[in-house]
Regions:
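Hydrophobic residues embedded in beta-strands of well-ordered beta-sheets
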Residues: 64-65, 135-136, 203
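Active-site substrate-recognition segment that forms the wall
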Residues: 73-74, 78-200
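Flavin (FAD/FMN) cofactor-binding and adjacent substrate-gating region
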Residues: 1-44, 49-50, 56-60, 185
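Mid-domain beta-loop-alpha active-site segment that forms a flexible
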Residues: 19-40, 85-86, 155-162, 208, ...
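Conserved beta-strand-loop-beta-strand element in the redox core of flavoprotein oxidoreductases
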Residues: 55-75, 79
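Short loop/edge segments at beta-strand edges and connector loops
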Residues: 1-2, 50-52, 69, 177-179
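C-terminal catalytic lobe of FAD-dependent flavoproteins
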Residues: 30, 167-247
Length: 247
């Protein structure tokens, strides 16, 4: 009810017809999460090469897999193709390209007035996230523009308008930054996750679209089962790369 909504979120627009409260709804800092995961992996022996990208994947003798980069050739028992929006840019010998394309998303960070927002709010034209430093994140656009990661004035204005429609006090908020990213979208908006039928030892984990970070724990569990040859989760049937053929 409107009265209850105002009690939980006093700064919200007074003309709201109502709202659904989800007490467990949260958010995560992607950069911090990624750095934490990488640090933890290094402690267990992982090595990272961030200055070069994979170019080609092909089968190797004895069921192994070869990955070629611009300056190295690597062999492994298992290789996971998890290149997000760039997954189709890595050629897999004998296989079709992964049917994934980039969808640009733009997001604003506003320097909000104190107490502007208590919780994550979703509305018809966007969402707001109260950040620990007092700022508010405003998201986000969905744009089919290829690999263009520039931000646009039109998107900034539309997102600011969406923010003000949800929390009017944000009308005077200063724009701190604009972020852009590319989401990996598959033809059916469902992740591509499973073993390759063409290259033994190759595992696909891509096309998570707008929910890659949210799906991280599940993706890790499913891929781990495949890497270590454990019984696969039945959920993988709906995610199988074979549904597109040639993978």
């Amino acid at each position: 009810e409107p009265a209850g909504f105002a009690e939980f979120e006093p700064s919200a627009a007074p003309d709201a017809a109502g709202a659904l409260l989800i007490p467990t709804h949260g958010f995560v800092g992607v950069t911090s999460l990624t750095l934490a995961a990488a640090t933890a992996a290094e402690k267990f022996g992982a090595r990272f090469s961030v200055a070069t990208g994979a170019i080609n994947i092909q089968p190797a003798p004895n069921g192994r897999v070869t990955v070629r980069t611009a300056d190295a050739t690597l062999d492994a028992d298992r290789v996971i193709l998890a290149a997000g929006s760039w997954s189709s840019q890595i050629t897999v010998e004998g296989a079709a390209a992964v049917p994934v394309k980039p969808i640009r998303g733009q997001l604003l960070q506003l320097q909000a007035p104190p107490g502007a927002l208590r919780r994550v709010i979703w509305g018809p034209d966007g969402y707001l996230v109260p950040w620990p430093d007092g700022s508010v994140l405003v998201g986000s656009t969905v744009e089919d523009v290829g690999f263009d990661e520039t931000h646009t004035h039109d998107a900034v204005e539309r997102l600011k308008a969406a923010a003000v429609s949800l929390v009017p006090s944000l009308a005077g908020a200063e724009l701190a930054s604009v972020r852009t990213g590319l989401r990996p979208k598959g033809p059916d908006d469902v992740p591509v996750l499973g073993r390759s039928r063409v290259v033994p030892g190759l595992i696909y984990a891509t096309a998570h679209y707008r929910n890659g970070v949210l799906f991280t724990p599940l993706t890790v569990a499913l891929v781990s089962d495949l890497v270590f040859d454990r019984a696969p989760d039945p959920a993988l049937r709906d995610l199988d790369p074979a549904r597109f053929g040639g993978l």
